[in-house]
UniProtKB/Swiss-Prot annotation:
Keyword Metal-binding: no
Protein function: One of the primary rRNA binding proteins, it binds directly to 16S rRNA where it nucleates assembly of the head domain of the 30S subunit. Is located at the subunit interface close to the decoding center, probably blocks exit of the E-site tRNA.
GO biological process, one term: translation
Gene3D superfamilies reported for this sequence: Ribosomal protein S7 domain
Assembly notes: Part of the 30S ribosomal subunit. Contacts proteins S9 and S11.
CDD domains: uS7_Bacteria (cd14869)
A Pfam family that the UniProt record links to this protein: Ribosomal_S7
Taxonomy, superkingdom: Bacteria
UniProt family annotation: Belongs to the universal ribosomal protein uS7 family.
Name of the protein in its database record: Small ribosomal subunit protein uS7
Record keywords: Ribonucleoprotein, Ribosomal protein, RNA-binding, rRNA-binding, tRNA-binding
Gene Ontology MF terms in the entry: rRNA binding; structural constituent of ribosome; tRNA binding
Example of a GO cellular component annotation carried by this entry: small ribosomal subunit
Amino acid sequence: MPRKGAPAKREVLADPMYNSKLVTRLINHLMLDGKRGTASTILYDAFDQIKEQTGNDPLEVFEEAMKNVMPVLEVKARRVGGSNYQVPIEVRPDRKTTLGLRWIVQYARSRGEHTMSDRLAREIMDAANNTGASVKKREDTHRMAEANRAFAHYRW
């Protein structure tokens, strides 16, 4: 364990096109092998498609999608007396955002549309409409936490 405490979190810079730190974080999650230019092109194309298809501001649609995907509760394994319990815990705000972004990108990659920008645009629009695989993942996570509510007193 480090003697000086945890290292300071680095702040991400706001995206130059949409002036949003959340968009920068989505680009970082999309990025593979350090190719930031490719990732930002994919995202901007997806946002253009969202604007065409919905007629709304793509940033607002994306923020609505994030609100629908971010989990409130999750389960964490805790060992008590030789058996493992899935203990429901509240999700920290920074982890909520990270999980939401991760799930949107993960389920966009597994979709069947032709290009990644198509997949990402569809996943964001589905999430904004409270449908789609990433919203289902959040509901499954909440269902798991609800099912294990009896073990909530094992929180630490």
